[in-house]
Amino acid sequence: MAERRVPFTFLTSPSWEPFRDWYHGSRLFDQSFGMPHIPEDWYKWPSGSAWPGYFRLLPSESALLPAPGSPYGRALSELSSGISEIRQSADSWKVTLDVNHFAPEELVVKTKDNIVEITGKHEEKQDEHGFISRCFTRKYTLPPGVEATAVRSSLSPDGMLTVEAPLPKPAIQSSEITIPVTVEAKKEEPAKK
C-alpha cells in the first residue's frame, strides 16, 4: 500500500485567523466595569499600579489633563480622589484623606488598639448617571506612645479630612551626667584642755 501524504499549509484560506476557535464574541476581555473610559495617552500610569485610582501626577504633567468641567475631567477627578497622605514631623503625626464625596455626618473616625479607623458610608443617591452608593474603611497604625485621646480630626470645605495626633516628647537621655560638687563647711575642733 502506498503512503498517502496530505500537505499541511497555513494558507488554506486567505482569511486565516489562528485564534478563531479560541475567541468567542460573547466573552468580554479587558473590561473595567463601572469606570469611565479615559484615553491612556493623557497621562502615564505608574509601572507598579494596575488600578487607575492610585496615581499622582507630577506638576509638569498636570497641563496635559483635560479641563475640570469636561466629562473626562470629572471622571479623572473621581479616579484620583480617595488618596491619603501620611506625614510625621518631630512633634506630630498627620493623615490627610480626600473624602469629598461624603458629608461630615457620613464619616466616622475612631481609635482602638493603637489603630485609627476612618469609615465613610452614604446610602444610595441619585446623580447624573443613575444611582450610586459609596463606602470605604481606612486603617492607620499610630506611632508608639501616642495617646488615643489626643487624636483630633477636622474636615476642610473642599473635602479633605485631616487626622492629627501629637507625638510624645522623648525623655532626654544622655550617657554623660554631671554630678555637682558640694562644699562642706569646715568643722571647728573643740579646744584642748
From Swiss-Prot:
Transmembrane segments: none annotated. Smooth, cardiac and skeletal muscle, hardly detectable in fibroblasts or focal contacts. One of its GO terms (cellular component) is cytoplasm. GO terms for molecular function: identical protein binding; protein folding chaperone; protein homodimerization activity; protein kinase C binding; protein kinase C inhibitor activity; unfolded protein binding. It is found in: Cytoplasm; Nucleus; Cytoplasm, Cytoskeleton, Spindle. PROSITE patterns: SHSP. Residues 74-182 form the sHSP domain. It comes from the Eukaryota. The modification Phosphoserine is found at S15, S80. It holds the Pfam family HSP20. GO terms for biological process: barbed-end actin filament capping; chaperone-mediated protein folding; negative regulation of actin filament polymerization; negative regulation of apoptotic process; negative regulation of apoptotic signaling pathway; negative regulation of oxidative stress-induced intrinsic apoptotic signaling pathway; negative regulation of protein kinase activity; negative regulation of protein serine/threonine kinase activity. Keywords: Actin capping, Chaperone, Cytoplasm, Cytoskeleton, Nucleus, Phosphoprotein, Stress response. Small heat shock protein which functions as a molecular chaperone probably maintaining denatured proteins in a folding-competent state. Plays a role in stress resistance and actin organization. Homooligomer. Homodimer; becomes monomeric upon activation. Heterooligomer. Belongs to the small heat shock protein (HSP20) family. PANTHER family: HEAT SHOCK PROTEIN BETA-1 (PTHR45640:SF7), HEAT SHOCK PROTEIN HSP-12.2-RELATED (PTHR45640). This is Heat shock protein beta-1. The gene is HSPB1.
